[in-house]
Amino acid sequence: MASVFGSDNKKVWVFITEPNWERPYEDKLEYVERIRFCKSQYSVRMDKFILLFNKIDRIGDTTEENAMQACSNEYEGLFNAFRNHSPLASLFGPKYLFKFVRFTTGTYGVPQPGIPAHYTPSRDNYPAALWNAIIESIKG
């Protein structure tokens, strides 16, 4: 892992978050700090970042803007680690240096005695959005 992290090759980093993560506030702050550390210590200038907001079905099929706000509220300070500090960013560039992807694998039924567990896959737009973000990050 150290050789991959330390290489000068372009990398696409995917950081996974989820709404209503049932962890203490301190654990969430520690997770944000680990992401910050990873970004500052291991990434190189040409690396790209994807912030995956998994289990989006927990808060409904919300807009990207609402999902970003929910993610920002859940993981205090996370977005600041990716803020675009370029002087021209406020006029022309993106506010943050990541692609935000809403994601869900689908829904899982609660197993009941005598009834097999049930799984309903998500709509195709969720994995397609992740795939497109990865491809754009590789090409861009």
PLM features: residue spans?
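Inter-motif core of Ras-like GTPase G domains
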Residues: 1-24, 41
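A generic secondary-structure signal
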Residues: 3, 34-41, 81, 85, ...
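Short glycine-/polar-rich loops that comprise or flank the Walker A/P-loop
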Residues: 8-12, 44-48, 94-97
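Structural beta-sheet core signal
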Residues: 13-15, 51-53, 102
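Short, catalytically relevant binding-site loops at active-site mouths
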Residues: 20-22, 56-59
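Amphipathic helical hotspot of TIR/SEFIR-family domains
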Residues: 23-44
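Canonical P-loop GTPase G-domain recognition
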Residues: 50, 58-138
